[in-house]
Design a protein with these regions (language model features):
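Extracytoplasmic
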Residues: 9-43, 225-230
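Residue-level signature of mid-helix packing/kink "hotspots" within the transmembrane helices
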Residues: 26, 54-62, 146-147, 252-256, ...
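Conserved MFS/SLC helix-loop-helix module at the cytosolic interface between two early adjacent transmembrane helices
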Residues: 59-98
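Helix-to-loop junctions at the C-terminal end of transmembrane segments
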Residues: 61-72, 258-272
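Cytoplasmic helix-loop-helix junction between adjacent transmembrane helices
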Residues: 103-142
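Transmembrane alpha-helices of Major Facilitator/SLC transporters
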Residues: 246-267, 282-285
């Protein structure tokens, strides 16, 4: 008999589980100038680690899907979190910016595995408009991560060297892994699948490819802004690291508000139409 879980707690738990990426990126942002000074490199080399993180995160999701479908959401989540914690810890001992790049890639790779399992755990339980609403609620809770992460990062940098950021990320991942092991019931029943055929099915599905392209373009623009915020606010405008979260947080307050708008729109409109008009507005504003 499968263990049941409170609906609200499930949403909170999956939100925290899927927050490994924003925590890994946004907690790190206030430390970028200090890391550049520590390794005596141009700040843009440290910013490049954000792109490397996103590449590792994307590749991790490719491998995370088959792992999730073979061993289940719970095991896949724990494997991802433990790997994320391990490489977050190893970053502390980086002797060069290039070593940091490697560990950041591997940290993100396991982060990608984690997030795939979080998404799959929702898909196992909900479908259609209900799934869209649950994802919006998760998005709303998860949006607190990029809002709070720079605050944590700035506080850590104020009292500790940059390595403290990765001590925090290590502890964060281990705590989440504990609660996933303790409380998240398995929601997947294994059925034998051909991985290559599964990917072929997705890659040849026109609607799926269009959706992925739209998401890639939309989030690509979003992460370009995130990658440069540390330099723009701290280096270019000369804002103190302690105040960085206030300026950075404005973006995510708006994001949370728009997720709430999306939840309300889903009650009366199709997700496809909402995405179409939202993308058009983003293009015009950008």
């Amino acid at each position: 008999m499968r263990k049941s879980i409170n609906h609200l707690y499930l949403i909170i738990l999956i939100s925290i589980l899927s927050s490994v990426a924003p925590m890994g990126i946004d907690t790190y942002l206030p430390s970028i100038p200090e890391i550049a000074k520590y390794f005596d490199v141009n700040i843009h080399k440290v910013e490049l680690s954000l792109s490397i993180f996103l590449i590792g995160f994307a590749i991790g999701q490719i491998f995370g899907g088959p792992i999730s479908d073979r061993y289940g959401r719970r095991v896949g989540s724990i494997v991802g979190l433990l790997g994320y914690a391990l490489f977050s810890f190893l970053i502390i001992f980086s002797s060069s910016i290039y070593e940091l790049w490697i560990y950041r890639f591997l940290e993100a790779f396991f982060g990608g595995i984690t997030v795939v399992n979080a998404t799959a755990a929702v898909r196992d339980r909900f479908s259609g408009q209900e799934a869209a609403k649950v994802f919006s609620l998760i998005g709303m809770v998860r949006s607190l991560a990029p809002l709070l992460a720079p605050v944590f990062g700035a506080a850590i940098i104020h009292f500790f060297p940059w390595e403290g950021i990765f001590v925090f990320l290590t502890i964060y991942a281990l705590i989440v892994a504990f609660f996933i092991y303790k409380d998240l019931p398995e929601s997947f029943t294994y059925t034998k699948q051909n991985i290559i055929e599964s990917y072929k099915l997705v890659l040849t599905h026109k609607k799926a490819m269009k959706a992925m392209l739209v998401l890639a373009i939309s989030f690509g623009a979003f992460f370009i802004i995130i990658a440069k915020t540390s330099y723009i606010y701290i280096e270019y405008f000369g804002i103190k690291t302690d105040y960085f979260p206030l300026f950075f947080g404005i973006n995510f307050i708006i994001l949370i508000a728009m997720i709430k708008v999306n939840v309300n729109l889903l009650k009366t409109h199709e997700a496809k139409n909402i995405a179409k008009y939202a993308t058009l507005i983003q293009f015009c504003v950008g």
